[in-house]
Amino acid sequence: MKKLYKKILIAAFALCNIYSCDYLNVSDELAGNLRSLDEIFDNVSYTRRWYANIFTSIPDYSGITAAAGSITGFKNPWAGMCDELTVGYGDAKLYNKTDKNAANMNFHRWGTCYKEIRQANIFLAHAKPIAANGTHVDVLTEEELTEMKANVRFMRAYYHYLLFEQYGAIPLVKDLILEREDNLDLPRNTIDEVISYLDEELTAVAKELPQKALHDDDQHNAWPTKGVALAVKAKMWVYAASKLFNGEYKEALAVTNLDGTRLFPDKDPNKWNKAVAALEEFIKFADEEGNYELLNTGNPSQDIYDLFQTYNKEIIWATAATSWGGMTNDMFDRRCTPRSEQNGMGCIGVTQELVDDFYMKDGLPIQATSYLPQSTLYTTEGFDKYTETVKAGSKEVQVANNVSNRFLNREARFYNTVFFQNRRWHVTNNVTQFHKGSPNELSGTIYTHTGYMLYKRFNREVSMKSPGVQNKFRPSIIFRLADLYLLYAEAVNEIDPQDERVLTYLNKVRQRAGLSNIEELNPAIEGNQELQRLAIQRERRIELATEGQRYFDVRRWMIADQDGEGRQFGYVHGMNMNAAEDKFYEEVEASPIVFRRKMYLYPIPDDEMKKTELLVQNPGW
């Protein structure tokens, strides 16, 4: 079975790199201008091409920023569209700085997802086994086709899920095949209809997909398995139970179809029970025969780094179609390399808000919260030695350098995420600085706005140094176990905050990061629903930082328009890059961030609204 999946995969993903197609002419392009679907699906090569194209819109969360036009809603502009990052170049650069309307919103998934759903439905309806015929010896067996159709059925559900995540209530295409000359003009289904359809499809297809997780390092792919389907279903139910989709977005409650059907439901607390049930189903599968487990060898710093470098048992789903780019392409690696290094562009800046949310190594925050007291380890005064491992020729050595005390004694996830003033670049051993007059100062057209740079997911062998490694593969993670553990803690807390599983699964993530159990630091948190809720939200903020989740979390929690840890309006902050080194550590406004209540959901694309007679727009747009 595994060999068969690998055979399908090699053919499909090789073709994914060659063929892409427009919604209207995809059939002609893929089939070499053949006119009949029968002719396409009588041909093994054309059938495989059609199949391969259904996978081309799997998200790549390594794509934070790149040259204009190359970042889409299937990449990760989301990290730069919230309070995590400032993006100094590319399509996401200006998003947070101006108000938006339905006509100028970027990063839509709408048209592409519906194109992929259409292609999936055509494949499911027309693909058939193909025997050898004359000189054509390639075959498509019944067994292989069964596996292919299971994958396609999953992808159809997943594209519906991506639409739901971004827009809420959407038209459900299901098995409908729209002809090329047809316009997509269907009314929106209700939220409850959408989640019911997704639940049914993902439950069914989970039985048809491979029943074991795939972790082999040669499986550089986004191949769905039972675990992937269960994870998507579980996450979908958490969305469905959350405030945004569960009766607490007041403006959405007034949205109706033209026939009066209300699209967004009243609050239903029982949806949290369904979320818990779906998460338990996933976790049971994860625990069976070690399908998934946190990467935890007892070395938090190394584990958190290694997690993103190669396939491992924490990864539920990942893709090899990445945007790391190495040091010779205009993509992630160059943009996360300081300008002071050869070929570095240094334009992805971590916000002060994210910097400040990481815990100290004692597991406490730098400022007191309602759920944890302030750490006594934190101070902004003075400088001291920071020791780290860097390259020295062919060896790795420990070096110490004076840094601000505000950067000392932080947790391991901080050092794996944030590159800060006076830290040494890992390959060249150069001290990196961002103050006025330094090579990375606030000048030119490409720069970090905050005096920090993103370090998370970077590979520490990559550089332009000769001899050196200019490009290094690592998977682009879509779902991982820590995310699902924190969702489980969140969902159980909403049902029964006294349930010990709330802190058990929160602490699993903290323990891997080298932090104490949270109730040991504040016994009053145990069983307190609001305090546990806030602690879980903070943990998701830290653990999943810049992975494309924060944007959607603050929206489903409906905290983006409130003062507090979820605030998405006003300014994000950073160090004073306009000052000399002695004044650099003054916190200043780095970049504006605009949020309106309408931005809790994406608008349906304006060009679709101009064509439709049946669609109604999301509130405020």
Give the ranges of each region predicted by the language model.
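Bacterial Sec-dependent N-terminal signal peptides
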Residues: 1-31
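Long, intrinsically disordered, low-complexity segments
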Residues: 20-23, 113-116, 197-199, 258, ...
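Membrane-proximal, proline-rich intrinsically disordered regions
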Residues: 21-73, 255, 391-392, 406-408, ...
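Glycine-rich, aromatic-lined ligand/substrate-binding cores of catalytic
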Residues: 46, 304-308, 312-439, 498
